[in-house]
């Protein structure tokens, strides 16, 4: 399931965050944090994990997502890996790969299972060429290039890549979510069911039908969730 999450940050918030990141001296070679599979195909820059600016900006992003009902519905978050930040420019790219299954949070000993991958775009799409995120799913390859402040949520099991940036610079945040429901098919069913309930609420639909659907939703969540 691939879901676009609009307006995680306003355009002004995204621009201010990008400016602070661009001015930072904490950028390092992105291969420093890549795994065995990713390192040979990863060519980008990244804000060092655990740096003060990464922690500050990451906290802002997580706080905004916690208030975003579409993100909650799609990801059903249990744990969120502290957001990271990357930059692509001058032909930089990231070849096709699958994210590692488990991420160790630096300095904490905590582990996060990467059920859901998230990319939050911070650069307006007209300011750079290339840089599309390509995600392979059951319906083929999905090409993603969103407005600044919008995010894309997709299964951590997906093959994905970032095309070379040939003009300008693409700055984004990326991170992972350990979901209450680890299986993507089950999450997709719950997402569709929640959407149907919300539409019934908005249209003042049949109350008995709404109660039945709400009951089904929570019983399925109870059956499938890990806390």
Swiss-Prot record:
It holds the Pfam family 2OG-FeII_Oxy_3. The keyword NAD does not apply. 2-oxoglutarate binds at residue 170. Fe cation binds at residues 97, 99, 160. It comes from the Bacteria. One of its GO terms (molecular function) is 2-oxoglutarate-dependent dioxygenase activity. This is PKHD-type hydroxylase Bphy_5374. It comes from Paraburkholderia phymatum (strain DSM 17167 / CIP 108236 / LMG 21445 / STM815) (Burkholderia phymatum).
């Amino acid at each position: 399931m691939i879901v676009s999450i609009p307006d995680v940050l306003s355009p002004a918030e995204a621009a201010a965050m990008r400016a602070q990141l661009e001015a930072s001296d904490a950028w390092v070679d992105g291969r420093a944090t890549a795994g065995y599979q990713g390192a040979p195909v990863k060519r980008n820059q990244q804000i060092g994990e655990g740096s003060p600016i990464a922690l500050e900006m990451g906290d802002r992003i997580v706080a905004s997502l916690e208030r975003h009902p579409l993100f909650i519905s799609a990801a059903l978050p249990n744990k969120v890996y502290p957001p990271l930040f990357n930059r692509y420019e001058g032909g930089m790219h990231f070849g096709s790969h699958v994210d590692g299954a488990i991420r160790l949070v630096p300095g904490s000993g905590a582990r996060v299972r990467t059920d859901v991958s998230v990319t939050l775009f911070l650069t307006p799409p007209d300011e750079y060429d290339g840089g599309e995120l390509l995600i392979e799913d059951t319906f083929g390859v999905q090409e993603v290039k969103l407005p600044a402040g919008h995010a894309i949520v997709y299964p951590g099991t997906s093959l994905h890549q970032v095309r070379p940036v040939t003009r300008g610079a693409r700055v984004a945040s990326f991170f992972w979510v350990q979901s209450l429901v680890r299986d993507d098919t089950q999450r997709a069913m719950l997402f569709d069911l929640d959407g149907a309930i919300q539409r019934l609420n908005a249209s003042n639909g049949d109350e008995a039908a709404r109660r039945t659907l709400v009951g089904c939703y929570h019983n399925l969540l109870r059956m499938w969730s890990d806390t």
